[in-house]
Swiss-Prot record:
Keywords annotated in UniProt: Bacteriocin immunity, Cell membrane, Membrane, Plasmid, Transmembrane, Transmembrane helix
GO molecular function per UniProt: toxic substance binding
Coiled-coil zones: none
Membrane topology, as annotated: Multi-pass membrane protein
Name of this chain's protein: Colicin-Ib immunity protein
Subcellular location: Cell membrane
Cell membrane is among the record's keywords: yes
Superkingdom as given in the UniProt entry: Bacteria
Organism in which the protein naturally occurs: Escherichia coli
Organismal lineage: Bacteria, Pseudomonadati, Pseudomonadota, Gammaproteobacteria, Enterobacterales
TM annotation in the entry: 7-27, 38-58, 87-107
The protein's role, per its UniProt record: This protein is able to protect a cell, which harbors the plasmid IncI1 ColIb-P9 encoding colicin Ib, against colicin Ib.
Amino acid sequence: MKLDISVKYLLKSLIPILIILTVFYLGWKDNQENARMFYAFIGCIISAITFPFSMRIIQKMVIRFTGKEFWQKDFFTNPVGGSLTAIFELFCFVISVPVVAIYLIFILCKALSGK
């Protein structure tokens, strides 16, 4: 599975990243003595870096199994149901580090096996 990430896609994925980073930064700024909040903020930064790749990997995998027609239904494209898109983006943000790590291991194993 090849990732084709364009500049437009990266810029589009910056919007949710900036929102989540801002929320975490404001929480950390108010309570800088809390070590857990500092580590959560560092984890948030790492997830922000891997988020666009994670979202693309998940989209490619889901489209492979369900087909493109499934994602073009009114349930997913209706602007009123935009909360579903927000939930999907938050899900991708939370699991971005493990997804990218698994993808990199998969690519490395594939390259080492010579296929």
